Amino acid sequence: MKDELFLRGENVPMTKEAVRALALSKLELHRASHLIDVGAGTGSVSIEAALQFPSLQVTAIERNPAALRLLDENRQRFACGNIDILPGEAPMTITGKADAVFMGGSGGHLTALIDWAMGHLHPGGRLVMTFILQENLHSALAHLAHIGACRMDCVQLQLSSLTPLGAGHYFKPNNPVFVIACQKEENHVRDI
């Protein structure tokens, strides 16, 4: 989905189109029934997932009041009745397990969020995270290795977009984004 389709607001983050496409692919939602989107922002990941997989139940968690309004407006705009919005900050209590968790940031609670996410995943469930800070990348990789996450991979995505400049065009660079994907092992016994 094009980024322009989503209602946006100042200081409300949105996972951009190319990053969103890669993250959704890494979540492997074709076999999922429940996705948790932590820090949903405008709802771009939740909405695209809900539209691609109409039988998927999506739980979108967001703490920012302005983002919550945009998230709800975007949910209505795309008629996504399969998205539940939970105001608040993860880690939080959620009933039931998920097949996939997406984290678009950590709010300074990275390892606690990883533990929380793994505790809310079914065995074999997927966790996908995106970061722009190298410190978060290194902390996440180290913690995932420590807790025994499997099928772990990481991609650095750096895109440039064709942009007009005077009478010509140039490729305007965007900041690199790190995308980490992993799986809760099938026989995982360390639930949080």
UniProtKB/Swiss-Prot annotation:
Signal peptide: none annotated. Keywords: Cobalamin biosynthesis, Methyltransferase, S-adenosyl-L-methionine, Transferase. It catalyses: Co-precorrin-6B + S-adenosyl-L-methionine = Co-precorrin-7 + S-adenosyl-L-homocysteine + CO2. InterPro entries: Cbl_synth_MTase_CbiT, Cobalamin_biosynth_MTase, SAM-dependent_MTases_sf, Small_mtfrase_dom. It comes from Salmonella typhimurium (strain LT2 / SGSC1412 / ATCC 700720). It is an enzyme of class 2 (transferase). This is Cobalt-precorrin-6B C(15)-methyltransferase (decarboxylating). Transmembrane segments: none annotated. CDD domains: AdoMet_MTases. GO terms for molecular function: cobalt-precorrin-6B C5-methyltransferase activity; protein methyltransferase activity. Pathway: Cofactor biosynthesis; adenosylcobalamin biosynthesis; cob(II)yrinate a,c-diamide from sirohydrochlorin (anaerobic route): step 8/10. One of its GO terms (biological process) is methylation. Belongs to the methyltransferase superfamily. Bacterial-type CbiT family. Its EC number is 2.1.1.196. S-adenosyl-L-methionine binds at residues 15, 39-43, 62, 90.
